[in-house]
Amino acid sequence: MAASIARGCQAAKGLGPSFRSARALLPVSTSVASRVLAGPGRRQITGPSEPGVFQPPPKPVIVDKRGPQRRESRFLSPEFIPPRGRTNPLKFQIERKDMLERRKILHIPEFYVGSILRVTTADPYANGKTSQFLGICIQRSGKGLGATFILRNTIEGQGVEICFELYNPRIQEIQVVKLEKRLDDSLLYLRDALPEYSTFDMNMKPVAQEPSREVPINQLKVKMKPKPWSKRWERPKFNVKGIRFDLCLTEEQMKEAQKWSQPWLEFDMMREYDTSKIETAIWNEIEASKSS
């Protein structure tokens, strides 16, 4: 019995080296390999870095270089600048505070003479207690709280103009349907032009405008009705650029109008109104009101 047990132990000792040699030939498991790679001094390779995994390229940034980019500029509404000759600007400083408080309630967008606007006002006698009017801005005038703008449209063949007070509490909304400029700072001569130049659909849809672009300038020149006109628009003091005078006046009439020219006024530096310092002070007031 003892001899058989001794022979069994010797056989087991002989099988030990054979098992160790067979284990060395087996492939290393994945868990063991990951522990080896994640050892000290090595980073563990996981995720999309493994070979055979697709990595999408970064999204390209497309820059439109077809047109000039608009510079980042701040728009200061012209009614903020006080008229020339005021030595004590206290009145306009107090008015600017009221104007800034009003702008916190009503959004007054950027617009120019020549832009098409839609204005919604409170009207106790209209259906829905509100009324709308759409038209082209032909004039901006006034300073401070007295700033006004005139909209013109032709309705059923009749020219209609409405003068709105910019800071009137009855105004509920001012929408810019089409933002653009014209060749002149005043378009009052549209009263004497053909009706087609001041006719717009009351249900006109807003035209999208990219904020990075410059405000476009409409180079349109209108055709006038036969004389008489409300004013002598051909005279140099009006400096009108948006009228086709060659279609309504003769050469003799144009020469006669040039007799009223005053070419020396172009070189009169005292007529220039430098508002750079005033604009800087006004912008400081605007920034202070925003932070308060």
Swiss-Prot record:
Predominant location category: mitochondrion
GO molecular function, one term: structural constituent of ribosome
Domain of life: Eukaryota
Record bears the keyword Ribosomal protein: yes
Alphabetized Gene3D superfamilies for the sequence: 2.30.30.790
Keyword Isomerase in record: no
Biological processes annotated in GO: translation
Stored InterPro entries: Ribosomal_bL19, Ribosomal_bL19_sf, Translation_prot_SH3-like_sf
Record region (Disordered): 39-68
Keywords: Mitochondrion, Phosphoprotein, Ribonucleoprotein, Ribosomal protein, Transit peptide
Gene Ontology CC, one term: mitochondrial large ribosomal subunit
Modified positions (Phosphoserine) in chain numbering: S77
Coiled-coil intervals: none
Intracellular or extracellular location(s): Mitochondrion
Pfam families the record matches: Ribosomal_L19 (PF01245)
Signal peptide region: none
Subunit and interaction comment: Component of the mitochondrial ribosome large subunit (39S) which comprises a 16S rRNA and about 50 distinct proteins.
Family: Belongs to the bacterial ribosomal protein bL19 family.
Full protein name: Large ribosomal subunit protein bL19m
Species this protein is from: Bos taurus
